[in-house]
Amino acid sequence: MYYCISFTHKNTDIALREKLSFSNEAKKSEFLKIISTHENIEECLVISTCNRVEIVAFVKMACAEFIVKSLALLCDVDKDILLEKADIFEDSGAIHHLFSVASSLDSLVVGETQIAGQLKDAFAFAVKNNFCGVHLSRAVHSAFKCAAKVRNETQISKNPISVASVAVAKAKELADLAQKKAVVIGAGEMGELAAKHLIAAGAKVIILNRDLQKAKDLCERLGVLSEYDSLENLKKYLNQYEFFFSATNAPNAIITNSLIEELPYKRYFFDIAVPRDIDINENENISVFAVDDLENVVQKNLALREQEARMAYGIIGRETSEFFRYLNDLALMPIIKAIRLQAKEYADKQLEIALKKGYLKKSDKEEARKLIHQVFKAFLHTPTVNLKHLQGKMQSDTVINAMRYVFDLQNNLEGLNQYKCEFDMENNDEIY
């Protein structure tokens, strides 16, 4: 069954999410290797962003305690706290949740489109490292299709919003950004988003980054309203400008009290990184906004999008039902094929016995074979038609299991692999 354990802005604070975050691929790979050794876990992947950690798996039976214990040991967190906080989804609930995540209905900012790329990256990593097979591939591919339908049939992603844009929106409430200079620390995806929104608001941006070439490349994409410098000069900029947006992947805070000088004007720091980049004291001239502090702005956007979200959830519900109908169809067709193949094998076997015992002349073999095959085809016609009529119906699972038992069919039916997942496992760059 499909299985999902979820830690998000809805059930954890930023301090806990910092500890759970997978800031590098080595940590993610280590965790997936650990949990994939469990006898009940067949496939798994991890989605890790500033607002969520999602463990998505295909399992034989529920194993939340093992997964959470493994996560707790790796991240040095109390297992009982994680079990208390975790949202756990099974089967249709897990698929509905995955589709909601992919469609940005579960995001801090509903309608933001970053999550699709983050899911794509998580999936590609799992496929590349052999943690993900046909079951999760089908689920993720269907999640992308659902997300596309939500975008195309609702207005929820029009004028897309991200945590970075919410931070800039908050800055615009505090001051007119036109002609001001804002410092963006970090040249990654979140830093680039913040810079784009700042430029759209009329500000000029300064990009600070450890890798100067990456900062230069970003400025070339941004255009004339940007410049760049090394992160080594951070202190100089911190004590020269008013607005700072920090979005690095540093494991610890990079902006601390030791770098801050007292100045006679207000400065605003927006920490949009997880783990947090900023650890300074606030006072009348220094204000710090972390991811969780942006909730008020987020709520305004949620109110505007409430109707679109209701429509989107309707789509997700229908797509979830359609996904399980699709799985039932995949299961039924191999059953039909296996029963017919079994009948053919028994008929051929009995024909050979009849020939050996002299019940039939060898010259009559082919005519007898045709007759026998016509008989079993006629006999199986009505069961085959009735099985096909079950496709997409609730009772199909019960019938499938009964047919497997009655005809002694193996769990991995011959022919199942012909139902190729739409995701090409050999070309995992063609995911989305």
UniProtKB/Swiss-Prot annotation:
Binding site for NADP(+): 186-191
InterPro entries linked: 4pyrrol_synth_GluRdtase, 4pyrrol_synth_GluRdtase_dimer, 4pyrrol_synth_GluRdtase_N, GluRdtase_CS, GluRdtase_dimer_dom_sf, GluRdtase_N_sf, NAD(P)-bd_dom_sf, Shikm_DH/Glu-tRNA_Rdtase
Site (Important for activity): 97
Record text about domains: Possesses an unusual extended V-shaped dimeric structure with each monomer consisting of three distinct domains arranged along a curved 'spinal' alpha-helix. The N-terminal catalytic domain specifically recognizes the glutamate moiety of the substrate. The second domain is the NADPH-binding domain, and the third C-terminal domain is responsible for dimerization.
Enzyme class: oxidoreductase
A GO biological process held by the record: protoporphyrinogen IX biosynthetic process from glutamate
Binding, substrate: 49-52, 107, 112-114, 118
A GO molecular function held by the record: glutamyl-tRNA reductase activity
Pfam families the record matches: GlutR_dimer, GlutR_N, Shikimate_DH
Enzyme Commission code: 1.2.1.70
Protein name per UniProt: Glutamyl-tRNA reductase
Keyword check for Metal-binding: no
Catalytic activity: (S)-4-amino-5-oxopentanoate + tRNA(Glu) + NADP(+) = L-glutamyl-tRNA(Glu) + NADPH + H(+)
Keywords for the protein's UniProt record, in alphabetical order: NADP, Oxidoreductase, Porphyrin biosynthesis
Active-site residues annotated for this sequence: 50
UniProt superkingdom: Bacteria
Protein family: Belongs to the glutamyl-tRNA reductase family.
General remark: During catalysis, the active site Cys acts as a nucleophile attacking the alpha-carbonyl group of tRNA-bound glutamate with the formation of a thioester intermediate between enzyme and glutamate, and the concomitant release of tRNA(Glu). The thioester intermediate is finally reduced by direct hydride transfer from NADPH, to form the product GSA.
Cited function: Catalyzes the NADPH-dependent reduction of glutamyl-tRNA(Glu) to glutamate 1-semialdehyde (GSA).
PROSITE patterns: GLUTR
Pathway the protein contributes to: Porphyrin-containing compound metabolism; protoporphyrin-IX biosynthesis; 5-aminolevulinate from L-glutamyl-tRNA(Glu): step 1/2
